[in-house]
Curated annotation (Swiss-Prot):
Record localization: Membrane; Cytoplasm, Cytoskeleton, Cilium basal body
Keywords associated with the record: Cell projection, Ciliopathy, Cilium biogenesis/degradation, Cytoplasm, Cytoskeleton, Disease variant, Joubert syndrome, Meckel syndrome, Membrane, Retinitis pigmentosa, Transmembrane, Transmembrane helix
Organism classification: Eukaryota, Metazoa, Chordata, Craniata, Vertebrata
Gene name per UniProt: TMEM216
Record annotation: effect of changing residue 73 to H: In JBTS2 and MKS2
Pfam families, sorted: Transmemb_17
Top-rank taxon, per record: Eukaryota
Single GO biological process annotation from the record: cilium assembly
Protein name: Transmembrane protein 216
Amino acid sequence: MLPRGLKMAPRGKRLSSTPLEILFFLNGWYNATYFLLELFIFLYKGVLLPYPTANLVLDVVMLLLYLGIEVIRLFFGTKGNLCQRKMPLSISVALTFPSAMMASYYLLLQTYVLRLEAIMNGILLFFCGSELLLEVLTLAAFSRI
């Protein structure tokens, strides 16, 4: 028995987006790799470059905050897509903007930006843009039922 006001999708009518789910899966693995590499890059910068300590600490704290935002965004996006729910998918759409802003910060505004970081953050922005487009299309499909 469903709670009052909730209804399931009609039998045989699946509106979940397979391409979106594939992007969420790939982005999850990419994010795990990204955050590990970024931690090693910060270690490299802290040891070999004249990186101000306050800036290094700020960048690492922002990286941990970014990790939290990404995990929550991917969780709600996957949950909303697979359960065909608008609210979790909408939360994921809303969290895409802070996520893209953090990727842009690491791409453009750090004290030192290495070429590897520029490439990695460009890929992150591609994932954010692709997922945002597919999330909006999936939300439109969910709104039709």
